[in-house]
Amino acid sequence: MTAISVKGVSHTFETRRARLRALEEIELEIGENEFVTLVGRSGCGKSTLLRLMAGLLRPTTGLVEIGGHAVTRPRRDVSLMFQRSALLPWRTVIENVMLPVEILRLDRRAHRTRAEQLLTLTGLEGFEDRRPNELSGGMQQRVALCRALVHDPSVLLMDEPFAALDALTREELSLELQRIWGEERKTIVFVTHSIQEATLLADRIVVMSPRPGRVARLLTVGADRPRSLGVTAHSPELDRVGAELHELLFAREPAELREPSRDR
């Protein structure tokens, strides 16, 4: 079943001085419970596409649908997670996680239980009453992930959520996200500049062309799950997809990315 449909979407940013075409005729379908990563050069419109899916922007032309319904505004069944955790410093961990419950006026008792379960799932049991300044960057992002999941959305949109972290923490959280996705089974769209992150996490990788962004290539990652990192986790399939992705992103002629083609 299709969770997200992007139909002929183009988007232009307009100012008094200029018009910037960010996206051009995007066509994309993402299946229910599928994990999709978006990769491409800086400025190709990855984050813009994510914001269109979230209902934070309206496309200039075209249509975005989630669950068969047009996205015209932010929806409660869609969560968006950013590069920075944006935790409220005066709130405790559990209070930060519960914020969407308050905003959406959901049942506090039932969702308090879910919040505690998510904190346990992400290794934060015992930190419920700590404040953000008492946590490491990786722990803060775990709290942000719990907050994004607490109201049980069907779709999770993630805009480079681990990019500001050190390499070791980033790898740890990538593996943890894969495990959580395996348990929660959400539809996830994940923006990244990391080839390793894209191949490790994705069922499919959407490679976007330079601006104006188009879907230049769709790569299917056929490696078994759960996936691991390191020498002992060598996977010919991940190596193959990573090499193809590297070739696409670092091609001498960027115009190669401008012509969409099917999976190889």
Functional labels for PLM-detected ranges:
Residues 1-3, 12-25:
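A short, flexible loop at the N-terminus of ABC-type nucleotide-binding domains that lies
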Residues 39-41:
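The feature captures the beta-strand-to-loop junction immediately N-terminal to the Walker
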Residues 62-74, 114:
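Conserved ABC transporter NBD signature motif
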Residues 91-98:
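Short coil-to-helix segment of the ABC ATPase nucleotide-binding domain corresponding to the Q-loop/switch region
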Residues 156-159:
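Catalytic Walker B motif of ABC-type/P-loop ATPase nucleotide-binding domains
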Residues 130-133, 151:
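Conserved signature/switch motifs of ABC ATPase nucleotide-binding domains
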Residues 98, 102, 109-127, 179:
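Conserved ABC ATPase "signature" region
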Residues 54:
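Helix-to-loop junction immediately C-terminal to a conserved catalytic motif
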